[in-house]
């Protein structure tokens, strides 16, 4: 009887270790889908789908082929094709990677953005503004995002960024984004008050399959100077009292 219980315990621990290793691929999967979704859809729609190798070998380089083969081998070619054939118009990288079983999901997750601040509160063109955010996870997040949206004084131009958070346990966390004013001919960067929205989501914020828990707002002021554009970059600080992983990869969404 004792041997039976020990065997069950070993199998249970092994399953947890396997899940942790598999979920460690989540950021890699999300990056891969963000970068190679278009190529994959073209390959799959072309009907060359006899095996993982047949599909993945048609991607442009060895790194992309390796990531594709790894993800495809986990679920098998039939399930891999099924996921991509069911995407429709909502190509949500987090949802795709959850369907490929490398990103965890939790329908009972819950989290709250607590506070946000911008430093400095105002500055001339050329200033880098740091947007800080503190958030609390009440119930474990599967795969989600902390996202920011900055809207210029005209209300017509937005800059978006998000940081991926994976298997985040209950606790308090903080992270930050940078809004850097850099010269560009593509878009005007007018002086005035910029509105900042920060949100936390299960899934990709704004996507069909996601849940946005809450949002908080802040602002900063750009004073007169040369016309430039804003760039959003994520910092992967992700400090907190709980546990989980945070990716500093920035996905420009708007």
Swiss-Prot record:
Disulfide bonds: 26-103, 29-97, 56-68
Residue spans of biased composition, Gly residues class: 233-245
Glycan-modified residues: 110, 219
Chain positions covered by the region annotation Disordered: 231-254
InterPro entries: SaposinB_dom (IPR008139)
Localization in the cell: Secreted
SMART domains: SapB
Gene Ontology BP annotations: aggregation involved in sorocarp development; cell-cell adhesion
Signal peptide from the UniProt entry: 1-19
Residue ranges of domain Saposin B-type in the record: 22-107
GO cellular component: extracellular region
Outcome of gene disruption: Cells form a higher number of smaller aggregates.
Family statement: Belongs to the countin family.
Function according to Swiss-Prot or TrEMBL: Cell-counting factor that limits the minimum size of the multicellular structure. May up-regulate the expression of both gp24 and gp80, which mediate cell adhesion.
Name of this chain's protein: Countin-2
